[in-house]
Amino acid sequence: MEKPSPTRRQTSSLSTISNGMTMTNDNRDTTNTNSGSTSSNNSQPSSSSTPPAASGPVTDRTKVNYVPKSDDPSSFQYYPDDPENPVNKYKFALKADSQYYDPCEESSKLSFQCLERNDYDRSKCQEYFDAYRECKKQWLTARRKNRQQWE
């Protein structure tokens, strides 16, 4: 007996997929028709006058404080992470001994994204690398000052 060629198998599976998709489209059309008739028969007042509750991060640029209102440039922070955050201390304490924990993970991701955007030209992403280094320095100095909090 002769085995069927791979093209025959592919063709038969494609026809099954296209039939399945056609059936799905038919079901969607039926569902849309039913839901349309249901909503037109429904005469209850809608509560669209109430705005939905705001959830998630603040997206309005005018409400975000990028730089603190201080004249001292040493208080400026040029990276999104806060390595001295109690959450970072907790996560660091929970990790296994052989695991690595990076409290400056967001800065690290930003530097990698910059490299990917700029065809891995390191000179264009130097600011991101500097921000990551500053974050790591802050974390290491905080760990050295209060060793017991980080263990």
Curated annotation (Swiss-Prot):
Residues 1-10 form a transit peptide. Residues 19-51 have a biased composition (Low complexity). GO terms for biological process: mitochondrial cytochrome c oxidase assembly; mitochondrial respiratory chain complex assembly. A motif (Cx9C motif 1) lies at residues 104-114. Residues 7-18 have a biased composition (Polar residues). Residues 101-143 form the CHCH domain. Belongs to the COX23 family. This is Cytochrome c oxidase-assembly factor COX23, mitochondrial. The lineage of its organism: Eukaryota, Fungi, Dikarya, Ascomycota, Saccharomycotina. The gene is COX23.
